[in-house]
UniProtKB/Swiss-Prot annotation:
<comment type="subunit">
    <text>Homodecamer; pentamer of dimers.</text>
</comment>
<comment type="similarity">
    <text>Belongs to the PanB family.</text>
</comment>
<keyword id="KW-0566">Pantothenate biosynthesis</keyword>
<feature type="binding site">
    <location>
        <position position="82"/>
    </location>
    <ligand>
        <name>3-methyl-2-oxobutanoate</name>
    </ligand>
</feature>
<dbReference type="GO" id="GO:0015940">
    <property type="term" value="P:pantothenate biosynthetic process"/>
</dbReference>
<dbReference type="GO" id="GO:0000287">
    <property type="term" value="F:magnesium ion binding"/>
</dbReference>
<comment type="function">
    <text>Catalyzes the reversible reaction in which hydroxymethyl group from 5,10-methylenetetrahydrofolate is transferred onto alpha-ketoisovalerate to form ketopantoate.</text>
</comment>
<dbReference type="InterPro" id="IPR015813">
    <property type="entry name" value="Pyrv/PenolPyrv_kinase-like_dom"/>
</dbReference>
<dbReference type="GO" id="GO:0003864">
    <property type="term" value="F:3-methyl-2-oxobutanoate hydroxymethyltransferase activity"/>
</dbReference>
<keyword id="KW-0808">Transferase</keyword>
<dbReference type="InterPro" id="IPR003700">
    <property type="entry name" value="Pantoate_hydroxy_MeTrfase"/>
</dbReference>
<feature type="binding site">
    <location>
        <position position="111"/>
    </location>
    <ligand>
        <name>3-methyl-2-oxobutanoate</name>
    </ligand>
</feature>
<protein>
    <recommendedName>
        <fullName>3-methyl-2-oxobutanoate hydroxymethyltransferase</fullName>
        <ecNumber>2.1.2.11</ecNumber>
    </recommendedName>
</protein>
<feature type="binding site">
    <location>
        <position position="43"/>
    </location>
    <ligand>
        <name>Mg(2+)</name>
    </ligand>
</feature>
<feature type="binding site">
    <location>
        <begin position="43"/>
        <end position="44"/>
    </location>
    <ligand>
        <name>3-methyl-2-oxobutanoate</name>
    </ligand>
</feature>
<feature type="active site" description="Proton acceptor">
    <location>
        <position position="179"/>
    </location>
</feature>
<dbReference type="InterPro" id="IPR040442">
    <property type="entry name" value="Pyrv_kinase-like_dom_sf"/>
</dbReference>
Amino acid sequence: MITVNTLQKMKAAGEKIAMLTAYESSFAALMDDAGVEMLLVGDSLGMAVQGRKSTLPVSLRDMCYHTECVARGAKNAMIVSDLPFGAYQQSKEQAFAAAAELMAAGAHMVKLEGGVWMAETTEFLQMRGIPVCAHIGLTPQSVFAFGGYKVQGRGGKAQALLNDAKAHDDAGAAVVLMECVLAELAKKVTETVSCPTIGIGAGADCDGQVLVMHDMLGIFPGKTAKFVKNFMQGHDSVQAAVRAYVAEVKAKTFPAAEHIFAD
């Protein structure tokens, strides 16, 4: 079974980590069998599964239900579950109560969004036995504060993002996840922090990559984000597409230049 220690060893060895979102047992089992090391039960289910316009309405009850489903299908992969909006920002104690429910539902790690100001919560949780994935850069739960889905780290804000990563690393975060971050900045963060980094739209130099399952399978028609690749193209089954994703992450051929944000 994949553990925090496994991820640390992979970072040290330079072996890339493959992560995908999963929301139910059958896809979790398929991804697990295909060699995906980490399954993210993301609040992205609000849009991908529930048909909502953002992640904000997703409840802790929703997250626990889908975590239970994924846990029934996964045998080897590490399950990371999102703390949903409103379930952890009020206090460290509120965060622990919500995280404990997710862990009881089958999660092995919880993910929270936020920079330096959330590092205290990261420390509070990890000291009480709950591994934390700290999500920095573009944080979808704060999309209205950002004014939309924008690339992070431009306009003199690189140091602030680096400070966010350092704060969570110092607080004991098991993983730092960066979303929509300039590739060179993400590389610097990866070289600076001791914990593994996972990128989504954060270049090829992170310790691992993650995509939303529906995006990498080309389920949603129309325009997709720059960092998305449809792995169903050229493959005749979902399992073949997932295996291709894992292989490209491991070979460092995904993300390619066309998927990367640069100045």
